[in-house]
């Protein structure tokens, strides 16, 4: 296969480096930051669409309890999910939020909502994947923030990499237990 790639790229195989470990491409983000004023070098930004299944001007929990909603990221906006987490953090009927986190942004609205939930007395359990390439430092810092707020933080399982983004919100309304799930 290496020969085929070399032929296609018109390279000699002596210019190929073999490595057992993945290449560290974190420098790419630094290049991106330095070239921000050269927008012609970047792909056109795609704007996420608002889901027609949700009215973001109304509380989301009742809408979701009424019918299932499918959101497809990044094509649809993540905003409804962030609003849902904020609603859950403030809803007196919500007693727990459990979530897996893979990549955390420098200004994570997800973590802000989880911290608010913990501060409001909700049981918050989070599995954080520390081996999220290029985001390890953010994940470590946010994990400390979550722990400081009283969240129970678990750091993955040896030999397995958690890449899924799951959320389970548990709510008790009267005698009924309700679950809202994000997969």
Question: Regions from the language model: what does each represent?
Answer:
Residues 1-183:
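N-terminal localization/anchoring segments of enzymes in phospholipid and broader phosphate metabolism
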């Amino acid at each position: 296969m290496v020969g085929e790639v070399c032929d296609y790229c018109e390279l000699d195989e002596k210019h190929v480096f073999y490595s057992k470990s993945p290449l560290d491409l974190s420098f790419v983000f630094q290049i991106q930051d330095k070239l921000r004023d050269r927008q012609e070098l970047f792909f056109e930004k795609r704007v996420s669409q608002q889901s027609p299944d949700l009215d973001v001007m109304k509380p989301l929990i009742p809408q979701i309890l009424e019918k299932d909603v499918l959101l497809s990221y990044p094509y649809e906006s993540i905003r409804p999910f962030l609003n849902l987490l904020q609603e859950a953090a403030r809803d007196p009927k919500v007693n727990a939020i459990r979530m897996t986190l893979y990549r955390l942004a420098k200004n994570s609205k997800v973590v802000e909502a989880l911290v608010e939930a913990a501060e409001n007395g909700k049981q918050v359990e989070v599995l954080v994947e520390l081996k999220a390439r290029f985001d390890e430092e953010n994940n470590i810092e946010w994990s400390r923030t979550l722990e400081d707020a009283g969240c129970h933080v678990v750091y993955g399982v040896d030999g397995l990499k958690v890449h899924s983004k799951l959320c389970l919100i548990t709510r008790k309304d009267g005698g009924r237990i309700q679950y809202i799930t994000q997969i």
